[in-house]
């Protein structure tokens, strides 16, 4: 599957995820929060498209450790942060980036799980550092404080 198609699927998936109803305790199409609205999530889903397209166009099944999943997660969060003040898509970006890259190197759907797993296993220390930066930029809540390896420190 080509990178443009994969990016559009990622955008559509993001928009549909927030459109589900009901989503107890979460923003959805009939319930906003004081600091987040349904439209913030739609915008967030749209603005990740270019980053997902770039990530999927660069991934190479013969050199998985160079996939840079963490970099593209960070790039997507930075792009979202330009448009939206709150964390509206860190979770979906963390999930969809490796799946999208797995799709890019799969000849058919039956290879997606294996290829995505191999991409995840090939992540590097740099990916982890970029992921920590993405979590901090997104200002993700609910992480709790840790004595050691606290994501906020």
Please identify what each model-predicted range represents.
Residues 54-109:
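Long, hydrophobic/aromatic-enriched structural stretches that serve as scaffold segments
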Residues 1-67, 104-153:
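Phosphate-rich cofactor/ligand-interacting catalytic cores and adjacent structured alpha/beta frameworks
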